């Protein structure tokens, strides 16, 4: 009986999520869904949750867009049959069970037919060299930034279960069952004042990047073009909001009444709210990393190390897209907010630095493609501690740097802009360290609150072993 149930569960999980099309994890509230949509629907039934659609109540809900409109996502949940009663009673009716069983049988037959067809095609065709296989992420983003995945990061990246994903790693578990965690998309540092001087002595500012640091020749031009296109496409597909959606004219700035409400929040509540927003942004960064050619070929340990050390750095970089230079505000909690909104955090110096960094990077007026390649360069840093295959990571980072250089030249940017961007890496790392200092102080005051109310992802990202992963700054 147990084996039969296990086999049936495996068949059910082969059917994509009915809400967003992602990898499903079983039957939840009467419908086959992924963990993220299950958690989203459960939370939508708790308390007095109210969602509204900023568009025409007809938003497309799929794996990459499901987090953009809670209203349309909930309506789709209800339309496909997710039951409010199931939240209370946790059971399916006999009719629902029979219907699902029939669907599993149909899907099984379809898979067999497809397999037969695929085998015949494989005898005639082979995959083009260098062609990337489509990724099927096993994680899901909820509208509140909460993920429902009980797997560690190794399973999260590779789509394995927790049992399958248990591999030796210098940094252990990296749980992504995300709930709330402090928002660092608003954390900068004193920008230019703290920006270390970069020792890049080449006169050209660009030619120094035309070979690998180990002396190997540059990769073929076609390889660089392919990598550049892959990263730029992945960036656009994994941005939380399109740049058009972030136009300040589409959103309100925090009003005085709203400002007072934020400032009256307790320090604990404000940290938690910010945590949710950062966690939400980090999940998009993880998806971005998974789509970068070469990342999934790295060993599992190195994937985890790079994500753990670099995901917040990329969140900071992406912040420049959501910065309004007209009034020194960033997009936060569905409004454009100034530094004063974050007063309750008790981190005025850190918040000031965050805004200064966003302003500094925004002033470079980077295109989306330039932001995407720079984000990938920041993420694939070969100087992280605990990397097992530093040379492979270094070669990937160097390829990304050369691709970025080529793009900047193609866009006729000033020669010195690449040097400026490389210097920003030290700045953003210093920001992350300052955030760690603030978090440590907060955790010392409210250890129980951090333990019980902060998202697991946030706690894993910025736990006691986080600083061991970061390269030591001079």
From Swiss-Prot:
Residues 450-461 are annotated as: AF-2. A zinc finger (NR C4-type) spans 17-37, 53-72. Residues 98-144 are annotated as: Disordered. InterPro entries: NHR-like_dom_sf, NR_DBD_ROR, Nucl_hrmn_rcpt_lig-bd, Nuclear_hrmn_rcpt, ROR_rcpt, Znf_hrmn_rcpt, Znf_NHR/GATA. SMART domains: HOLI, ZnF_C4. Nuclear receptor that binds DNA as a monomer to ROR response elements (RORE). Required for proper cerebellum development. This is Nuclear receptor ROR-alpha B.
């Amino acid at each position: 009986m147990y084996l039969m149930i296990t086999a049936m569960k495996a068949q059910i999980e082969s059917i994509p999520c009915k809400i967003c099309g992602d990898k499903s994890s079983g039957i939840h509230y009467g419908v086959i869904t992924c963990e993220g949509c299950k958690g989203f629907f459960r939370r939508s039934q708790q308390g007095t949750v109210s969602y509204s659609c900023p568009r025409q109540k007809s938003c497309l809900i799929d794996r990459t867009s499901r987090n953009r409109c809670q209203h349309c996502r909930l309506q789709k949940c209800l339309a496909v049959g997710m039951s409010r009663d199931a939240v209370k009673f946790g059971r399916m009716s006999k009719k629902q069970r029979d219907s699902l069983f029939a669907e599993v049988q149909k899907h099984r037959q379809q898979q067999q037919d497809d397999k037969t067809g695929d085998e015949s095609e494989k005898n005639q065709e082979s995959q083009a060299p260098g062609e990337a296989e489509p990724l099927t992420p096993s994680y899901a983003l909820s509208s509140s930034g909460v993920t429902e995945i009980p797997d560690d990061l190794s399973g999260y990246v590779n789509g394995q279960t927790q049992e399958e994903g248990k591999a030796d790693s210098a940094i252990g578990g990296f749980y992504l069952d995300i709930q709330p965690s402090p928002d660092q998309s608003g954390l900068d540092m004193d920008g230019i004042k703290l920006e270390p001087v970069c020792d890049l002595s080449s006169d050209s500012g660009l030619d120094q990047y035309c070979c690998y640091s180990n002396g190997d020749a540059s990769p073929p031009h076609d390889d660089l073009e392919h990598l550049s296109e892959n990263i730029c496409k992945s960036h656009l597909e994994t941005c939380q909001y399109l740049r058009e959606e972030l136009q300040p004219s589409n959103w309100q700035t925090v009003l005085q009444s709203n400002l007072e409400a934020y400032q009256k929040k307790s320090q604990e509540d404000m940290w938690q709210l910010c945590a949710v927003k950062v966690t939400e942004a980090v999940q998009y960064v993880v998806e971005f990393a998974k789509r970068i050619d070469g990342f999934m070929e790295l060993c599992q340990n190195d994937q985890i190390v790079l994500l753990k050390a670099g995901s917040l750095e990329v969140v900071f970089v992406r912040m420049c897209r959501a910065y309004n230079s007209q009034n020194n505000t960033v997009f936060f909690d569905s409004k454009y907010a100034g530094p004063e909104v974050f007063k309750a955090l008790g981190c005025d110096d850190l918040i000031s630095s965050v805004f200064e960094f966003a302003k500094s990077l925004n002033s470079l007026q980077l295109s989306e493609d330039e932001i995407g390649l720079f984000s990938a360069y920041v993420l694939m840093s070969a100087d992280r501690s605990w990397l097992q295959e530093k040379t492979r990571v270094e070669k990937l980072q160097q390829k990304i740097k050369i691709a970025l250089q080529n793009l900047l030249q193609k866009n006729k940017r000033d020669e010195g802009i690449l040097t400026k961007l490389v210097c920003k890496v030290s700045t953003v790392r210093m920001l992350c360290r300052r955030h760690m200092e603030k978090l440590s102080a907060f955790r010392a005051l409210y250890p129980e609150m951090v333990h019980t109310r902060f998202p697991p992802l946030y706690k894993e990202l910025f736990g006691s072993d986080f600083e061991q992963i970061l390269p030591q700054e001079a």
